[in-house]
């Protein structure tokens, strides 16, 4: 295993070196995104305050203090000094998203027309307008939510509609490779049919279904109207064509990622921090996967082109994902400097929607959506324990954040069903900054375990792990 890891790392390094011009341009764009966001945050923050788009830090004030401030604000009795002390600019995600989209669009133009991406519409970046449109729609939806406070049922519908541009331009495989145990079960139960062909006659005009023995590399195939829906190889691996069902899965992935970042929030820096950790893990994954540049899996060499594309992780997929992830890390790092404890700006729903969409879109573009779900393990856990409140089985307040104790300046368990309160329940009261770092440590551990599952434990389910 050690020798294999060394060899894979060497191949990844060679692949990165081969694509150094493109990766260098992406890195340059990421630096520009970081510097530009850092430069404009103070100006945009003042503009948002002037437009009365601000919030009060719940974890640094009591309910009585917030009500008193709101009453003074309505009566026009708030002094400027008091206002500047209490009010924190909100929805800075709109600036971050705008800077990100500007940089990515410029990078796409440069890569397409300066020779790095090839010529014509067949270059790997020609399909990016769809993903970028989805990111734009989600960003604007988040800003609308900041201003109008959209209800949850409407959020689900709108995020589903926002994922349509991505789904319409998706050019990847619609097949799923199942573990070997799945195929071996079929082999053991249907072994008596190995040397036979079974033709099922159908009325004229109806689809014809055939079970056929094929080439040695593909032991069993289930075909309807020349479309292979199930293929099982001699090794036992099964490739199942899902078609439109897979597109529904991708849409649901966008909905989940967008809202999961949004509900794991409430303390300074946690939204941006978790997004940065997942994005960095995704970058590492894509760089490592570049070692497979134009390598085909022998067991599936005879399958159709769509199946081959699913197993042939060419660098085109990774470069597109890195193009989306690099500038995102840049703008998020700049926002982190202002949003970490003590927060000088709030990111708002515009950032959480934007961040979740970028991570989902990059995984779909880079063909690693299942691996992304491993990185999202804390968000999945937080979502599962939140279900009783999200479905109103138990009372659900508007803000499910921990309770702030003004005497100790610590956060305590508010008995809401979130991972933040689980940590406080297990380890006791914490300072807000310490709680944020505890969440980020959990996120790092989840990403490391995700790599272990992806490259080590999956070997027990698949004959070949790439």
Swiss-Prot record:
InterPro entries: Glycosyl_transferase_4, GPT. The keyword DNA-binding does not apply. The chain crosses the membrane at residues 12-32, 91-111, 124-144, 156-176, 236-256, 263-283, 316-336, 345-365, 374-394, 442-462. GO terms for biological process: dolichol-linked oligosaccharide biosynthetic process. Belongs to the glycosyltransferase 4 family. PANTHER family: UDP-N-ACETYLGLUCOSAMINE--DOLICHYL-PHOSPHATE N-ACETYLGLUCOSAMINEPHOSPHOTRANSFERASE (PTHR10571:SF0). In Leishmania sp., tunicamycin-resistant variants are associated with increased levels of NAGT gene transcription due to gene amplification. This is UDP-N-acetylglucosamine--dolichyl-phosphate N-acetylglucosaminephosphotransferase.
């Amino acid at each position: 295993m050690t020798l294999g890891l060394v060899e894979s790392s060497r191949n990844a390094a060679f692949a990165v070196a081969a694509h150094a011009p493109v990766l260098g341009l992406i890195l340059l764009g990421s630096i520009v995104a970081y510097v530009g966001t850092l430069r404009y945050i103070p100006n945009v923050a003042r503009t948002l305050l002037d437009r009365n788009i601000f919030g009060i830090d719940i974890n640094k004030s009591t309910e009585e203090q917030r009500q008193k401030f709101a009453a003074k604000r309505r009566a026009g009795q708030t002094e400027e000094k008091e206002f500047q002390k209490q009010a924190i600019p909100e929805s800075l995600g709109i600036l971050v998203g705008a800077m990100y989209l500007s940089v990515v669009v410029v990078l796409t133009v440069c890569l397409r027309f300066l020779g790095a991406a090839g010529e014509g519409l067949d270059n790997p970046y020609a399909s990016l307008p769809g993903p970028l449109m989805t990111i734009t729609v989600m960003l604007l939806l988040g800003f609308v939510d900041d201003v109008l406070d959209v209800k949850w049922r409407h959020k689900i519908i709108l995020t589903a509609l926002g994922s349509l541009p991505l789904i319409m331009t998706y050019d990847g495989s619609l097949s799923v490779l199942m573990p070997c145990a799945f195929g071996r079960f079929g082999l053991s139960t249907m072994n008596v049919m190995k040397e036979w062909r079974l033709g099922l006659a159908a009325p004229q005009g109806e689809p014809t279904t055939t079970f056929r023995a094929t080439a040695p590399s593909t032991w069993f195939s289930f075909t309807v109207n020349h479309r292979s829906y199930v293929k099982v190889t001699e090794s036992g691996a099964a490739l199942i064509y899902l078609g439109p069902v897979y597109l529904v899965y991708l849409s649901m992935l966008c909905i989940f990622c967008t809202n999961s970042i949004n509900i794991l929030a409430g303390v300074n820096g946690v939204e941006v921090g978790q997004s940065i950790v997942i994005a960095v893990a995704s970058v590492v994954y894509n760089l490592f996967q570049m070692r497979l540049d134009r390598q085909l899996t022998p067991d599936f060499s005879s399958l159709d082109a769509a199946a081959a594309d699913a197993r042939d992780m060419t660098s085109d997929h990774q470069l597109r994902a890195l193009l989306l992830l690099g500038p995102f890390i840049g703008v998020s790092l700049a926002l982190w400097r202002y949003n970490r404890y003590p927060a000088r700006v709030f990111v708002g729903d515009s950032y959480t929607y934007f961040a979740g969409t970028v991570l989902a879109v990059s995984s779909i573009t880079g063909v690693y959506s299942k691996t992304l779900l491993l990185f999202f393990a804390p968000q999945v856990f937080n979502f599962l324990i939140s279900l009783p409140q999200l479905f109103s089985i138990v009372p659900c307040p508007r803000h499910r954040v921990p309770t702030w104790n003004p005497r100790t300046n610590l956060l305590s368990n508010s008995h809401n069903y979130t991972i933040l309160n689980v940590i406080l329940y297990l380890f006791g009261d914490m300072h807000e900054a310490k709680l944020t770092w505890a969440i980020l440590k959990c996120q790092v551990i989840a990403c490391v375990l995700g790599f272990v599952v992806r490259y080590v434990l999956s070997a027990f389910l698949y004959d070949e792990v790439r």
